[in-house]
Amino acid sequence: MSPRLRVWLVVGAAAVAAAAIAVGVTVATRSDVHEATSKAPPFVADPTAPAEVSRDVRDALRAWPAGTVRRLRILAERYPHSALVRLELGLALAFTGNQTDASRAWHESRRVQPDSPSAVRATDLLHPGMPPGLPPFVPAFTRARTKAQRHLLRGAVFQQALRPVSAEREFAAAARAAPNDPEALTAEAVGRYDKERPAEAFSRLGPLARRFPHAQTVRFHLGLLLIYFGDIAQAKKELALARAEGPRTPLGRRAQTLLRAGRKR
């Protein structure tokens, strides 16, 4: 099996697994810490954070409960562009029962370094009722043969690394390289999805569904985004339309998996 094919299979499996959480089972709340607790907040590794920042954050967490919040506030001043510091500061504040300041820290994490796993995780904590992460683009092909598909491949890899800004950049490049390709245009729309601004993606996918009424990729991803948005009923309709366009294709089978998960609710 080629490395590229393995990447695509992982991306597809991640889409099904993450969406099935929302359709088939209750999503666990990851910020259900509204009261003070003696338990120390976890360290959530971020590969984009410099080693020095990660080390300082770990040292601050080891001081729990005395001095952790103060130390993390100092680190936030020292590292003004670190999403990791603000993610951990928010967790520490939440664990002390200060949910208002925790939310403020998580918003800051998104603002100062949006292209990072910490920013994605901060968004999850701000929206605990939604599936974790962001909806991935799932390709209909298994090997990149064109310039646009190579951009899609790189975008998918960035998504797997929780680098949404870099992924969006690659998907936009794919759309420029193939402006009439529904798959590239769909990826561009998916890359724009943000839990705080979902309209940026839906406002593009809706017109694509009318422009390409039989494009399986459009219907599949519209259904996938609707799952993340929480509109399960409409998601099932879109996934059924995607399946009808080719039940034996990779996307058709994944649509069937999600529909089957939906019936277990």
Model-derived regions, located:
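Canonical tetratricopeptide repeat
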Residues: 88, 121-125, 153, 187, ...
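Register position in tetratricopeptide repeats
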Residues: 95, 125-132, 160-161, 194-195, ...
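Start-of-helix register in tetratricopeptide repeats
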Residues: 54, 84, 117-121, 149, ...
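Canonical positions in the second alpha-helix
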Residues: 74-75, 108-109, 140-141, 173-174, ...
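Alpha-helical adaptor scaffolds
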Residues: 53-66, 73, 127, 147-160, ...
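TPR-adjacent "capping" and linker segments in tetratricopeptide-repeat scaffold/adaptor proteins
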Residues: 36-52, 73-78, 132-150
